[in-house]
Amino acid sequence: MYKEYSDLKDKRILVVGLGKTGVSLAHFLTKHGAQVTVTDHKSKPELSVQLEQLGELPIKFELGGHSPKTFIAQDLVILSPGVPSNLKIFDYARSQGIKITGEFEFSAGFIKEPIIGLTGTNGKTTVAKITEAILTESGVKTWVGGANEKPLVDYLRLDDKAQVVIAEVSSFMLEHCDTFNPGNIVFTNLAENHLDRYRSMEEYVNAKRRIFKNTNQATTSILNADDNAVVELARDPAVQRGRIFYFSRKPALEPQIMNIGGAVNIGDEIRVRTGPEIESFNIKGMKMRGKHSVENIMAAILASREHGATREAVQKVINTFTGLPHRIEYVRKVGGVMFYNDSKATNVHAVLRALDTFDENVILIAGGKDTNLNYEPLRTSVKRKVKTLILVGEAKERINRDLGDFSETFLIGTFEEAVLIAYQKSRIGDVVLLSPGCSSFDMFDSFEERGDYFKEIVRKFH
């Protein structure tokens, strides 16, 4: 793979997918002398905004479909995120000796600065943002991108580079990773997800496992000791090649973790060891709710300490970081009822974490696009915590089959109606929680749009 910008001169490169990433790639590649072709299954009118962003760049276009002859005339094919990697035309191109890669893998190869690679089913963006906050407070210049809609190629286009790059890495990105080798790997947790894309949980895990493919003695892996699937992954010889720091909320693991290095939560304290000394941080003033938030903070402390984070910066961020929108986000209190927006909860594991946050009676709004997930693991929490279950969207029947017997349940036609009924069913002291356990694409363009609509409805209540 190319490592220097000069390697791109006169190379014939095909960019598949003309979304935000495709546009950025086209700008970067043409600037460095590549002969660029862009292909997309959408038509010219559908891509008018993107085509305008490319202006007069010397690019060839193949729009409205993909032809084999375009693929086999290239030195390299780069797929934008979201383009399925299993299309038959890609198999054909590979059979003709054409190299196919993803934007993330391609862009990462040019980055000379240290990279923190963050993966896991949930928590990636929050850990990235806490890590960024700690390092920024410590005077370390960072750049955050990857799976959070800011492609790595955007970093390559910057003149003013960071000291540390924090990259969120999804399973889709890892499918194409052959050479990606971050100095630090953070693995937050591992649970069933994306089963509309993967044929089995094993296939999903194998995609995630690829982040460890190129580890060496200089790699530090930061792993969740409380997640059995992550601990199982840690037995992989590739992980064992480098140093491992574990983080845990189990005080019983404290002697073991302090011996090898890592972080442990005991009461209102996080104990951390990344060098000879053991440090303690107080979490009494922590603003975020939920036990999982403590896990996220521990992961971020360990990652940032590898890059010069100061003790003072860590404590300040613990005391001031308020969390991110759409992640157990407090909206408002109406008539003694608290409303929380957890629209980012697009899988079962995320809903479990949300329910675990509350001691109050919960009216849970769930449902969305059906991605073949199994909701049975929620039964105990629903039985214990959920007073009323409001189901909406494409997956409502599936969720009802798995959970409907464990709580008063309503299957609702529209999202707005679901929120209204949740409010009607609530009483003083209750929590109304939007934590869908599904992606948003049956009714909305994104989890952000879904969460914003929820907040808009709730703000009209009086």
From Swiss-Prot:
It catalyses: UDP-N-acetyl-alpha-D-muramoyl-L-alanine + D-glutamate + ATP = UDP-N-acetyl-alpha-D-muramoyl-L-alanyl-D-glutamate + ADP + phosphate + H(+). Its EC number is 6.3.2.9. One of its GO terms (biological process) is peptidoglycan biosynthetic process. Keywords: ATP-binding, Cell cycle, Cell division, Cell shape, Cell wall biogenesis/degradation, Cytoplasm, Ligase, Nucleotide-binding, Peptidoglycan synthesis. It comes from the Bacteria. One of its GO terms (cellular component) is cytoplasm. Its main location: cytoplasm. It is found in: Cytoplasm. Pathway: Cell wall biogenesis; peptidoglycan biosynthesis. Cell wall formation. Catalyzes the addition of glutamate to the nucleotide precursor UDP-N-acetylmuramoyl-L-alanine (UMA). This is UDP-N-acetylmuramoylalanine--D-glutamate ligase.
